[in-house]
Amino acid sequence: MLTLKRAKELAAPMVTEEHLILHELNVCYAMGAMARYFDENVEHWQAVGMLHDYDYEKYPEEHLDHTAEPLRAAGVDEEDIRAILSHGYGIRNDVEPVTNLEKSLYTVDELTGIIQACARMRPNGIQDLETKSFMKKFKDKKFAAKCNRELILSGCEMLGMELKDVAEICIEGMKEHAEEPQLTGTS
């Protein structure tokens, strides 16, 4: 089974830009929280989250086209590779998210971008971010405008969950690990 340590080792040579590393970490820790919600292996889901943008920095226009083979060669399970590929469903490929792992990654990828933007605006970072504040910012299409809200809502629907519930789970998971992805604020 893929460990977080191994995922970080695999990601290190491919993901070197700070903003992408921070994004990977945010997705990683939000995925851990989703795993806890679904009573799944937290570290495994974190590891998949850590690798979700494996080829993005080097191949942004061909994102996910250069993921499967190198990860397969590194011994990553097919189920994990499929989960990683599925977060590009409808945008980069036709690998539809089916499992809770896949649906969560599909949803959390964009969702964490808005959560991160909310946290960066606050003196205490994510530590005092409440779901209601996130929901207010989510409705403002100009805030974190590059985050695909339609995709997030589609993912929540796939999961059979309300946006506020998924956001709360992810915010709490990101709070637990706020220091590493630099979400602790300025105060």
Please place each PLM-identified region on the residue numbering.
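Conserved active-site and cofactor/substrate-binding residues in soluble primary-metabolism enzymes
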Residues: 2, 22-26, 62, 99, ...
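Acidic/His-rich, divalent-metal-binding segments that scaffold phosphate/diphosphate chemistry
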Residues: 1-59, 68
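Structural signal for hydrophobic packing residues in well-ordered secondary-structure cores
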Residues: 14-15, 31, 35-38, 74, ...
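Metal-centered catalytic cores of metalloenzymes
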Residues: 3-18, 29, 89, 95-96, ...
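C-terminal binding/interaction regions
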Residues: 131-132, 139-172, 181, 185
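Divalent metal-dependent catalytic cores for phosphoryl transfer on phosphate-bearing substrates
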Residues: 38-143, 153
